[in-house]
Amino acid sequence: MSIRSAEDESRPFVLKGGGTERSMRRRVRSVQGVRSRENGARRFDLTLSENPFPPLPSVMEAMNSALAHANRYPEFLPERLPRLIADRVGADADQVVVGAGATGVALQIMQTLAGPGREMVFASPTFDGYPIMAAMAGLESVAVPLDSSGRQDLWGMARAIGERTALVAVCRPHNPTGTVAAASELKAFLFGVPRHIPVILDEAYAEFLSAEEALDPLELLARYPNLLILRTFSKAYGLAGLRIGYAFGHRDLVRRVRRLQVPFGMPETATAAVAASYAAATELNERVLRITVQREMLRTTLRRSGIRIPRSRGNFLYLPGPGMVETLARAGIAAKGYPDGSARIAVGDVAADRAVERALCGPALVRVERAAAEESGVWSTTAPADPVRAGNLRT
């Protein structure tokens, strides 16, 4: 499948060539970065859309303080963390369910709100966890191909809803393309979904949306009582290793999902990390902006060399077309691959991004394109959305 973005309609796909925050960045060896060295060459693993930065010093301090009490059990069922999140998003605590990452919460949703022999509708490609977890829950996956511009085909997904449909999932921004469904289209789609069918709105990358693209979650929930908004602390917050995710929605739906809440399943380190992260919203927003700028730098360089890339609103880029995975692999870069040979790569790590440029554009062309881009100012970018609207990073 070759994906074209609307802004690229006139351009053919051509692949040419074969503590302070600053001091921390100098010290850190990227989470994405050097996984191993083979024959002296650096190798990069960009498969998981990881945040390149470690937790902030204040977050590390909070986690270490919580670890001092690791001999004690956490809460039998989580109460503090749902309250923290509810206060942040403007909901009530009984409207929030937490779990082992967005993946764990999504599985809880499938197991409680759907059932064996029913169907789950989502786009294809999408977050890999959906078809895997659907199978675990005994659901049949109904995968709807993206449209010609590389976006989720919401109307195709609406047509795919039938008598056996028990659950629908929509990503915004979409994983893996990074495209964003227009607010009007999403609302029209949600309006058309029967009220007895729950809809997961996957906002794993919501913190990377611009203010114009962000939606008011409480307004959505007021209009669509069958909606569950799914989020994670793995991406913008850089806490993937702690496995903290949550969903919020109508309390009746959340009450059903909470039935599978694992006792003692949310460690105190997770609660401490979230509280400290909320307190460090300004610093975290700076990191989101830095990743966003780095993403646009890389996208600009690759597009100038003729590679057509959809505009992304995540901490990753989608590289459409056959041979992308293999080309990157030859340069020691592991990318998330798709059946047609397209690839998704994490962004934000400067060394890794430069390696991608060299692999896809060639060293000489990279120097020319980066100089031209810098001179023209195309690396400027839109700041992330007002955190009150886009996600969780607010002061």
Regions found by a protein language model. Give the residues of each.
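PLP-dependent aminotransferase-like
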Residues: T112-V170
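Conserved PLP-binding catalytic core of the aspartate aminotransferase-like
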Residues: I291-T292, E296-A331, V347, G377-W379, ...
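N-terminal "arm"/small-domain region of PLP-dependent enzymes with the aminotransferase-like
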Residues: S2-Y73, L84-D87, W379
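Conserved beta-loop-alpha segment that forms the PLP phosphate-binding cup at the N-terminus of a helix
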Residues: E79, A93-M120, G245
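Active-site pre-lysine segment of PLP-dependent enzymes
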Residues: A135, Q152-E163, P176-V199, E203-L239, ...
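PLP-dependent enzyme catalytic core of the Aspartate aminotransferase-like
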Residues: K336-T395
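PLP-dependent aminotransferase class I/II
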Residues: N226-R303, I307-P310
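Conserved N-terminal alpha-helix of the aminotransferase class I/II PLP-enzyme fold
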Residues: S65-A100, Q294-M297
